């Protein structure tokens, strides 16, 4: 089993792959064709973020297994051949190794987690993958940006900047068709930039005054409730 440092699209890839999005609140998985089309419904499951890294790896592997076992006919056929799995995860990801370089406490114990190896071993043990399984892991916003640059809003553009607001605030940069990771895998990240508006608001990283402390989805909702008295 291997991890990949492929560019946005491996032009030699013709078989479907499984795409997985791992966020702080949910895990979504789908079978995707080589041209980026969905081959069935998106399977979603809650992220056991407070149960630790191993529980999250279990949930990722379970989502992929369920998709292949009970998904569209194309998903069931993929069991008969080596399957590639692409995972976009919350946190700062060493994409070359498929390991979490650093992360906030949104997912307990996530820093240092070998996502690629952990998921590959679980899928092999479950009998839904072979030793030839290719697993590629990147930051979730990097993966999102790669998709937008390939066949989305940024298709045809030389450079693409993506800003994503969800449980946290993330950013990614695509240059000349490749995700730009930077020296420490942080290129494009803006959630933990200082923000004068944030003041002393606590951030999920343990510090205060960062953009994410006021601009992440939960914080937008909280600030709205505080300003309006809404419940």
Predicted features, each with a name:
Residues 40-77, 112-114:
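N-terminal phosphate-binding loop and adjacent alpha-helix
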Residues 48, 53, 57-58, 80-85, ...:
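Glycine-rich phosphate-binding loop and adjoining helix at the ATP-binding site
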Residues 13-32:
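N-terminal basic/disordered segments at the start of proteins
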Residues 1-16, 35, 66, 72-80, ...:
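Short, low-complexity, intrinsically disordered N-terminal peptides in bacterial proteins
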Residues 21, 29, 45, 87, ...:
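Residue-level signal for inorganic ion chemistry
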Residues 25, 37-38, 99, 178:
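Residue-level signal for well-ordered, solvent-exposed loop/turn and beta-edge residues enriched
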Residues 21, 140, 166:
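Active-site glycine-centered loops adjacent to acidic/histidine catalytic or metal-binding residues
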Residues 5-14, 32-33, 41-43, 52-55, ...:
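Glycine/GP-enriched mid-protein hinge/lid loop-to-helix segment characteristic of carbohydrate kinases
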């Amino acid at each position: 089993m291997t991890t990949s440092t492929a560019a946005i699209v491996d032009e030699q890839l013709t078989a479907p792959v499984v795409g997985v999005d791992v966020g702080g609140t949910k895990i979504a998985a789908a079978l995707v064709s080589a041209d980026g089309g969905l081959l069935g419904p998106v399977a979603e499951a809650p992220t056991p973020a407070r149960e630790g890294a191993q529980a999250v790896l279990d949930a990722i592997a379970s989502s992929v297994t369920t998709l292949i076992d009970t998904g569209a006919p194309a998903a069931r056929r993929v069991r008969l051949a080596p399957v590639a799995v692409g995972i976009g995860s919350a946190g700062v990801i060493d994409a070359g190794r498929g390991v979490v370089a650093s992360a906030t406490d949104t997912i307990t114990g996530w820093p240092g987690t070998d996502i690629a190896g952990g998921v590959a071993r679980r899928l092999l043990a479950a009998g839904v993958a072979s030793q030839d399984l290719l697993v590629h892991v990147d930051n979730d916003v990097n993966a999102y940006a790669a998709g937008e640059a390939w066949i989305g809003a940024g298709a045809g553009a030389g450079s693409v900047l993506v800003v994503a607001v969800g449980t946290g605030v993330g950013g990614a940069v695509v240059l000349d068709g490749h995700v730009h990771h930077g020296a420490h895998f942080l290129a494009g990240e803006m959630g933990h930039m200082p923000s004068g508006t944030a003041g002393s608001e606590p951030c999920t990283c343990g510090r205060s005054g960062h953009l994410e402390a006021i601009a992440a989805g939960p914080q937008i909702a909280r600030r709205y409730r505080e300003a309006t008295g809404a419940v």
